[in-house]
Amino acid sequence: MSKRNLIKCMKWIIALGIGVYIIYSLYIQLEYRHYIRQSIDRNYQMLSIISDIGDNLADRLSSFVELPLEKAESSEEVKEELFTNWRIVNEESRNIDNYTSIISTMYTGDKETDWSLIQYSLFRVNGFIQGMTDKFLEQQAYVVSDEEYEKMNAVISIYRAISEMLEDESVDLEALLKSIKEPMLVIDDLYQQTLESVGKDD
């Protein structure tokens, strides 16, 4: 093979290599974007399910906080209503916890921080409910302090806000986070610090 033909062959190989690299890079980029889209769509599906479950949880928790706890020992009816409402609250909280775990905070593009905060917030809410369940079981009685009542009402506000936001076809995650900020500050003492750490304290 002459030197001239060798140079032509080398140029052709280099051009082919560059072409393959460009095509492969575009393919990877398109696949990555597709994966991000799938991940975000799945997150919205989980959030929609959580919204439906949370709406029922909020209804039951509202019924629970309206019942006169002081009559639990003297009234079997009140005691039964407290038990039934809290049992459902606890079950729904566990269901929400499962769906919250499915939410992906990776491969969500520039919304990664928002999804992380939503997931963190839901875990903290469910942690409070689980803590109250453990307390009721340990004390074998429904004893709720004023601070705990305030947190229960905050839980109701959070799930009501999520349900309201999910009524729109296009969910604004930042608006959702703003709507649950105040009740989250009631539930989680470290929430303000968490917001500051991710630059969402405005």
Predicted regions and their residues:
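Immediate post-signal-peptide N-terminus of mature secreted/exported proteins
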Residues: 29-85
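Short acidic DE-rich linear segments
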Residues: 197-202
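Short, Lys/Arg-rich N-terminal segment immediately upstream of the first membrane anchor
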Residues: 1-8
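Hydrophobic membrane-insertion alpha-helices, especially the h-region
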Residues: 8-28
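Alpha-helical segments in soluble extracytoplasmic regions
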Residues: 60-138, 163-166, 174-193
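Extracytoplasmic/periplasmic ligand-binding sensor domains
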Residues: 144-145, 154-156, 161-164, 185
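Membrane-inserting hydrophobic helices used for pore formation or membrane fusion
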Residues: 125, 139-152
